[in-house]
Amino acid sequence: MTANARGAAANQQALLSPNVTLVFDGGSLGNPGKGYGSFITRGAVQTGDPERREYAGRRTNNEAEYMTLLEGLRYILREAQATGQDPTTLMIEVRSDSKLVVEQISGRWKVKNEGLRPLHAEARELLRRFGNWQLTWHPRSESVRYLGH
């Protein structure tokens, strides 16, 4: 097995066994309207109950989704650092019912909306601070099960 093959196998194994799972969901009352979101983490960094956020100004649903992802990633980084964990050793599984966010962050869809581009760039930058990560889409019912909405 070559070094590249070993590295790829190690990365795949790490993704099969994440240290931290982040589940997030954002939305808006009206679209655009008052933005809100919730996230929960499990594993090496845990929130306990879901963390709830409200966003100032008028937000689209997609903006609120991205903003909640950012809040969740920042939370994991803060808590890891506060407990002496090196974020580069963490393998993060991010789960969402937002097909748009999952596909854009994964690079399969382009970010066409100007307002989402800085949020997308920041999310990608935060994800680079972890050892490895993967985004997974799940049905809306999973978000409801984890977050209560």
Predicted regions located by residue number:
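RNase H-like nuclease fold core
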Residues: 2-63, 67, 74-78
